A protein has these predicted regions:
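Proline- and glycine-rich low-complexity segments
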Residues: 1-124
């Protein structure tokens, strides 16, 4: 059974409009920040992450005091697991003129000058 539907000129014009140009994927969203006087050029913001992560090498540079032990297991994007060396609490993170307190899980990472070294989760 077929039915005919009468369409006005206005509706017809809406269907004829072209779709907007598709934007390219910007990759990851990064911003500069300062932690303990150390400038981090590219901190990755991940709105789906519920934790903040920093590499052990940066933790050593910052001299933020002893790590608190943790039993947390972090599952990475490739579904592998990593075990943080510990957590450091109440770290001042400066984003432009805003200052936040954040907890960071400290993990061992291979150094790569082109990779982001900090992951900032949902609180940012």
């Amino acid at each position: 059974m077929s039915t005919k539907v009468k369409i006005s000129e206005q509706v017809s014009a809406m269907f004829q409009k072209k779709l907007p140009k598709k934007c390219s994927d910007p990759g990851m969203f990064t911003i500069p920040c300062t932690i303990g006087g150390v400038k981090v050029k590219r901190a990755m913001l991940d709105l789906f992450a519920s934790i903040n992560v920093m590499p052990y090498s940066l933790y050593e540079t910052l001299k933020l005091g002893p790590l608190r032990e943790t039993s947390v297991v972090i599952q990475l994007a490739d579904r592998s697991n990593t075990y943080p060396r510990g957590v450091i609490e109440d770290v001042l993170v400066e984003l432009d003129k805003l200052v936040f307190l954040a907890h960071f899980y400290v993990i061992f990472m291979n150094h790569d000058e082109y990779a982001t070294s900090i992951l900032l989760g949902r609180p940012f």
